[in-house]
């Protein structure tokens, strides 16, 4: 089936975001997911009591993790990644990317906050936002200006969403305070923290901790309530 690119993006948004959001905020399965399940002969073992629990357990606010934006295509290419039947994550040539090919898109955070508020009208908590990178020790120091640049740009876009767009953002926490094994790739060397930990992918190292440049920078950010970036 030939799917227009804009429609492919819409379907991907429904299945990867709205499906979960609608369940938690509205307390019911969205119509597009009911149609998807019916078309494939999927019958959920769910009772009226279960549906009532869904209705009674709706959330008071939305917590989101934002690291990157995704570009969706219905056309498969050599470097695309299949995410579902007929849908692929494609490379966006207009944004930078990390060492792990994650798209660096601060404006996407502002867009996402607007999108979620327009659909759900709930306060939003950005619970994860961070930059995974190879950190190199130089004379006993880690000068991770790339991480500062990433976080600063995303915080600025979040502030625009709050001040210019009126989005009720209730909080922000970066990922993360200290290096640990990446849940996404299983690597220690994909580092997110403000504090460096001497350990490699094979578990070798002293476990010595060292503050990166981003540690002092973020300390000023939170002390000033985001005014000093």
Model-derived regions, located:
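Active-site region of glycoside hydrolase catalytic domains
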Residues: 1-229
């Amino acid at each position: 089936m030939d799917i227009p690119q804009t429609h492919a993006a819409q379907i991907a948004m429904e299945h990867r975001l709205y499906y979960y959001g609608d369940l938690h905020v509205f307390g019911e399965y969205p119509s597009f997911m009911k149609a998807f399940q019916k078309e494939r002969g999927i019958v959920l073992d769910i009772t009226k009591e279960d549906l009532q629990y869904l209705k009674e357990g709706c959330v008071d606010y939305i917590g989101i993790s934002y690291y990157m934006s995704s570009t969706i295509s219905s056309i498969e290419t050599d470097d695309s990644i299949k995410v579902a039947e007929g849908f692929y994550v494609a490379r966006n040539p207009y944004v930078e990317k990390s060492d792990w090919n994650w798209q660096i898109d601060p404006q996407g955070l502002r867009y996402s906050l607007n999108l979620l508020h327009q659909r759900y009208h709930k306060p939003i908590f950005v619970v994860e936002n961070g930059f995974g990178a190879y950190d190199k020790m130089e004379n006993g120091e880690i000068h991770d200006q790339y991480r500062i640049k990433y976080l600063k740009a995303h915080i600025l876009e979040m502030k625009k969403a709050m001040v210019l767009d009126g989005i009720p953002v209730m909080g922000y926490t970066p990922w993360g305070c200290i290096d640990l094994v990446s849940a996404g790739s299983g690597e220690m060397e994909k580092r997110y923290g403000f504090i460096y930990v001497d350990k490699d992918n094979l578990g070798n190292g002293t476990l010595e901790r060292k503050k990166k440049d981003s540690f002092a920078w973020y300390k000023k950010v939170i002390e000033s309530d985001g005014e000093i970036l």
